[in-house]
Amino acid sequence: MMIDPSKKYRPFPPVALADRTWPSATITKAPIWCAVDLRDGNQALVEPMGADRKVRMFQLLCELGYKEIEVGFPSASQTDFDFLRQLIERDMIPADVTIQVLTQAREDLISRTFQALEGASSAIVHLYNSTSTLQRRVVFALDRAGITDLAVRGAEMVREGAAKASASTKLRFQYSPESFTGTELDYAVEICEAVMGVFEPTAEAPLILNLPSTVEMATPNVYADQIEWFCRALPHRDRVLISLHPHNDRGTAVAAAELALMAGADRIEGTLFGNGERTGNVDLVTLGMNMFTQGIDPGIDFSNIDHIREIAEECNRLPVHPRHPYAGDLVFTAFSGSHQDAINKGLHAMEKTNQDVWEVPYLPIDPKDIGRSYEAVIRVNSQSGKGGVAHILERDYGIRMPRGLQVEFSKVVQAITDTTGEEITSRGLWKTFEETYLGAGSPYSFLEHHTRPDPAGKDQRILTATVKAGGKVRDIDGRGTGPIEALVDALRKDSGLAITIEDYEEHTLRPGSDAQAVAFIKASLPDGRAHYGVGIDANFVVASLKAVLCAANHLSDK
């Protein structure tokens, strides 16, 4: 039995911001992105990346277009130090990419950080210390003044180290009041202002103030309120870039980041697919693709999402969930019958109108935009309906079933999937269609036919069809204005099966002079029973005659 949560947990206090403006704001451009897979992401892995995996991840991030990449904590890890030296000494950092390194406010760590950066063309030195009320009390046993002193002394040491560094390295600075969301807002402004006093940023050379939701503690709107409150209260706002670093403890990191952008932030730190401590960092792929679907260029190349996922899984040794937004195996897949029908109609409408704007029910994005095909969009199981079955047969085999046949055949498929409890593949669907319609050879199996004018009737023809029935080959004869009517007459004379043709459709299976034709016949009996028949042949007439016999065979069996 669950405990009473009111006895153990307290609600997060709201931010006093009655005149908040972010709810009416709109995201119109991508932020500055900083990928932290090689630090925040790596430290959360069961098996942290070795040198080869780190290089592969770094190369992927560069290929995608990330221009700021946090590469590690070189002063705290020999592995990170060696990796950074490898990137620099082997000239592996593109000219337009700035690396970022993390350091705490300790002289020995800061000195080691600058050693690691020797020879880099450009870098961001990221200084941080925790400022939350909880950590001040429990971890550091320091008051506000003591924590501010740590930050200021750290900033001074970073600036001194920068003064001694090679002039060939273009340095920028970043400060994070770690656990920002658990810090009193007035104190967050106070400590950041103190650090600004050391770095003396300008509008041309701004300081990055990174405001982490180190542990997600409230609903996304609260983070947005905190960011807007901070941006308003901070002096010289034009001299800083406000950076976000959301975590996903409550499952709303993406929403928190988006609302905080609306509240005035300029930059976001995150990881591919949200890898990171506990429930992860904010997912840069989802954030970027969310913007893409709103017509905003994220500035990142997600055109081959499966390749991105493959490398991320290889480097992190963690799978991406099948339902992960945009990248999961099943995110564009519909099993539901009503969804499949709507998607099928939407794709047909797009093809017919040839419009530029994407509008397909249940598909917020064209899968082709991220390197996916339509093949996995519709799959068939016991929850599926006629729309999904029809879509797959048309997409993979060129069969455009009439609506009535869609209903009829979907019942056959439903019976199979209900029995097996499993998905039926495209190949399995085609096999079932063949067995149900194209292989329905009892009692009649078509072999050949010929027609001739009927001397006894104007506009009438006599058809002789050679069929195999009961294991024997024989001819059946009938009269009619055309081959179909004549074959119906022949069946009535031969077996007494009095069918009426209710509907007839035909089309070619593919363009070209050698294309095969497919014919669909709906036939009924006087007692109201009806069934479809299907025939395929290089000749339209033969295809239609095969379809008549197929329907007759089904009605004979009933």
Curated annotation (Swiss-Prot):
Its lineage reads:
Bacteria, Pseudomonadati, Pseudomonadota, Alphaproteobacteria, Rhodospirillales
Name by which UniProt lists this protein:
2-isopropylmalate synthase
GO cellular component terms, alphabetically, are: cytoplasm
- Tell where it localizes: Cytoplasm
Q: Does the keyword Ribosomal protein apply?
A: no
Q: Which InterPro entries match?
A: 2-isopropylmalate_synth_dimer, AIPM/Hcit_synth_CS, Aldolase_TIM, IPM_Synthase, LeuA-like_post-cat, LeuA_allosteric_dom_sf, LeuA_N_DRE-TIM, PYR_CT
Q: Which PANTHER family match?
A: 2-ISOPROPYLMALATE SYNTHASE, PTHR46911
Q: Which reaction does it catalyse?
A: 3-methyl-2-oxobutanoate + acetyl-CoA + H2O = (2S)-2-isopropylmalate + CoA + H(+)
Predominant cellular place of this UniProt entry's protein: cytoplasm
